[in-house]
């Protein structure tokens, strides 16, 4: 109860502090309601279209709510990462993957850049929010609901992992890009000397590349108004297949993992990077298995192992040491799917298509 009161107080303070603050993105102005979250050099705000920008529906002004992500980019590398994130929000045309509504790159007076990305606001919250509510209420998720959520998230991942699954959307993607590439006039000038990745600028090549999210967690699974699970926060998403060819690349990737991956859901191959190592989209299958486990039991598998046996989290992950609670209410078939995902050897994990088939068999 005390924590709920504190959260309410903080929200009221946030709302009061931002009551007159607005952010302009292209031709629309958004009034900040409160801070939703922050991390590193990025902030996410709950915003509302200002009066002059309200959407008119049947003659009625609709006060639309959005999530607005602000990314501060002090370096060439950070602007490159930010631009990749912008492209990610337009790349995957699936109801199970988040899409942006608008975006803009702004030049600041000190020479740095700031990226603004307008995203849908998911009022139903995240999968982690749902798990937390059940823990507080002492209720449990049914197997049928588990499978429904798992199927949706896996379908979203299939869109990232499998270029063939995006072919049906190739035509619509061109139209979406034509509309949504509405950056400010100065954007081209800002990015003249930025070493952007080639796949960011070529829709043709992007359609043939497999991508990995690399930070699938319950907090990054959102629920749409009709209850569909939606993969969110594509800031960590990039080309799936990577070969570590030199020590500089190894060092940079290690730093990236530390900054972008959530440890309880991070696969062992990302914690033990080596020269000549090949990384693939199978990193997401491990994270997905851990996320499914958390949905079912309210705690991630390796954090549970740490609590029960005192093993370090990293050691438990590297050895794949975890267990299921005794007398589980879930079927052996569903537990078997989790076991297949949480395999230390990536080769032993199913592909996204194989995982989808396993879940569909449970759904029949």
From Swiss-Prot:
<dbReference type="InterPro" id="IPR000719">
    <property type="entry name" value="Prot_kinase_dom"/>
</dbReference>
<comment type="function">
    <text>Serine/threonine-protein kinase involved in vacuolar processing and morphology.</text>
</comment>
<keyword id="KW-0472">Membrane</keyword>
<keyword id="KW-0808">Transferase</keyword>
<feature type="lipid moiety-binding region" description="S-palmitoyl cysteine">
    <location>
        <position position="15"/>
    </location>
</feature>
<keyword id="KW-0418">Kinase</keyword>
<protein>
    <recommendedName>
        <fullName>Serine/threonine-protein kinase ENV7</fullName>
        <ecNumber>2.7.11.1</ecNumber>
    </recommendedName>
</protein>
<dbReference type="GO" id="GO:0005794">
    <property type="term" value="C:Golgi apparatus"/>
</dbReference>
<dbReference type="InterPro" id="IPR017441">
    <property type="entry name" value="Protein_kinase_ATP_BS"/>
</dbReference>
<dbReference type="InterPro" id="IPR052239">
    <property type="entry name" value="Ser/Thr-specific_kinases"/>
</dbReference>
<dbReference type="GO" id="GO:0106310">
    <property type="term" value="F:protein serine kinase activity"/>
</dbReference>
<dbReference type="GO" id="GO:0004674">
    <property type="term" value="F:protein serine/threonine kinase activity"/>
</dbReference>
<keyword id="KW-0723">Serine/threonine-protein kinase</keyword>
<keyword id="KW-0449">Lipoprotein</keyword>
<dbReference type="GO" id="GO:0006624">
    <property type="term" value="P:vacuolar protein processing"/>
</dbReference>
<dbReference type="Pfam" id="PF00069">
    <property type="entry name" value="Pkinase"/>
</dbReference>
<feature type="domain" description="Protein kinase">
    <location>
        <begin position="30"/>
        <end position="364"/>
    </location>
</feature>
<dbReference type="GO" id="GO:0005737">
    <property type="term" value="C:cytoplasm"/>
</dbReference>
<dbReference type="GO" id="GO:0032889">
    <property type="term" value="P:regulation of vacuole fusion, non-autophagic"/>
</dbReference>
<comment type="similarity">
    <text>Belongs to the protein kinase superfamily. Ser/Thr protein kinase family.</text>
</comment>
<feature type="active site" description="Proton acceptor">
    <location>
        <position position="215"/>
    </location>
</feature>
<feature type="lipid moiety-binding region" description="S-palmitoyl cysteine">
    <location>
        <position position="13"/>
    </location>
</feature>
<dbReference type="InterPro" id="IPR011009">
    <property type="entry name" value="Kinase-like_dom_sf"/>
</dbReference>
<dbReference type="GO" id="GO:0005524">
    <property type="term" value="F:ATP binding"/>
</dbReference>
<keyword id="KW-0926">Vacuole</keyword>
<feature type="lipid moiety-binding region" description="S-palmitoyl cysteine">
    <location>
        <position position="14"/>
    </location>
</feature>
<keyword id="KW-0564">Palmitate</keyword>
<dbReference type="GO" id="GO:0000329">
    <property type="term" value="C:fungal-type vacuole membrane"/>
</dbReference>
<keyword id="KW-0547">Nucleotide-binding</keyword>
<feature type="binding site">
    <location>
        <begin position="36"/>
        <end position="44"/>
    </location>
    <ligand>
        <name>ATP</name>
    </ligand>
</feature>
<keyword id="KW-0067">ATP-binding</keyword>
<feature type="binding site">
    <location>
        <position position="69"/>
    </location>
    <ligand>
        <name>ATP</name>
    </ligand>
</feature>
